[in-house]
């Protein structure tokens, strides 16, 4: 059976450019397996470093992990990224989201009012490129209890998710495992 091949080379610690090795070794040191996505990014040390730094900084932000997962699921669904939908289904469950919330998040929705409002804001970012989200969505997010810091992090998570889906789609990156 022929397996799907990526348009980009999927590197590991033996084939990656030297500038990518510190990040790859760090990822492998956690005992996990290197994802195909990181293997592709390793082809450009600058891109891998930028992604790793951006993601690392956002992990230390104020946006709850469940919110981050919901945003990533919604963007992956909107962008049609099977790679990320497969990966995020697992990580969302590990973050404590139930199957019902995962399904809702994929549609920019949630049973939790505050999360639903934030996802509507994220949806406006994704579906109206070149335009600011309507002011009422920004105001609704604030009224739902989201701070400016969390709203800015939402914008950042949307951009990180868009970048991730663009890489996997443009490279036709096969699912892990």
Protein language model regions, located:
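Hydrophobic alpha-helical segments
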Residues: 1-177
């Amino acid at each position: 059976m022929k397996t799907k091949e990526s348009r980009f080379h999927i590197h590991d610690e033996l084939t990656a450019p030297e500038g990518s090795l510190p990040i790859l070794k760090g990822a492998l040191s956690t005992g996990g397996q290197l994802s195909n996505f990181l293997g592709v990014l390793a082809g450009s040390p600058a891109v891998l470093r930028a992604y790793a730094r951006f993601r690392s900084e956002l992990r230390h932000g104020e946006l709850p992990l469940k919110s981050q997962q919901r945003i990533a699921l919604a963007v992956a669904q909107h962008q049609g990224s099977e790679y990320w939908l497969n990966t995020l289904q697992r990580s969302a469950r590990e973050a404590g989201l139930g199957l019902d919330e995962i399904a809702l998040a994929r549609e920019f929705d949630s049973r939790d009012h505050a999360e639903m409002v934030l996802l509507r804001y994220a949806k406006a970012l994704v579906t109206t490129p070149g335009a600011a989200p309507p002011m009422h969505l920004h105001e609704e997010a604030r009224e739902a209890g989201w701070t400016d810091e969390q709203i800015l992090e939402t914008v950042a998570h949307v951009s990180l998710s868009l970048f991730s889906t663009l890489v996997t789609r443009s490279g036709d990156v096969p699912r892990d495992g």
